[in-house]
Amino acid sequence: GGYMADANAGFANTISNYNPTDNWTNVFMKSDKIIPVIYTNYKQLHQVTDDPVILAVGDIIKVAAMHRVTDTYGPIPYTQIGQDGSLTVPYDSQEDVYKAMFKELDAAVEALMPNRTNNFAADADAIYGGNVEKWIKLANSLKLRLAMRISYAAPELSKQMAESAVKNEVGVFTSNDDNARFDSWGTDGNPIKVAVEYNKVKTHTNGTACTTAAGDSH
């Protein structure tokens, strides 16, 4: 096994010279940036509003970002993490992180369901334009994703969470039109976009393209 591409943009790394680095362990998820950014904004959100819809959306975004961190590193600071993103707190096991995320997603859906037809300001939502039902679908789909990922480790909990997600009245993603996608350029890019932004695989000496895709979304 080995690497198929440099971890950094610009093709200026050492992989092409068969000198692998450990950059994939820090560039792929950028947990040093995700955690402080998520929790700093999460704190600010709670300071400026008590709207249950907006706060539920914030919880969904937090889970969407943080589950990738725990899937990469296993134990992470989560339930006791400071709102400033401090890492100087005890780590939670991945089992405890997943259980906390299930509770947060359930609470978010519970808060959003009574407001499913009451869309909020479109200019406050760069992903779904204020469409509350889309956020419910995202929460259910994240719940289903997490359930599938523990199907061997905790089959009973996996079954319970998966069935709960798909049986919700709003349901889960059924097409790419449901995807949570945020297009951004310049300095406002997602710190993990380098992992998915160039989805082209070439093999053989003639550079034949085996697969080609673009972008990533939930």
Can you describe what each PLM-predicted range is?
Residues 6-218:
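Structured, solvent-exposed acidic/aromatic patches
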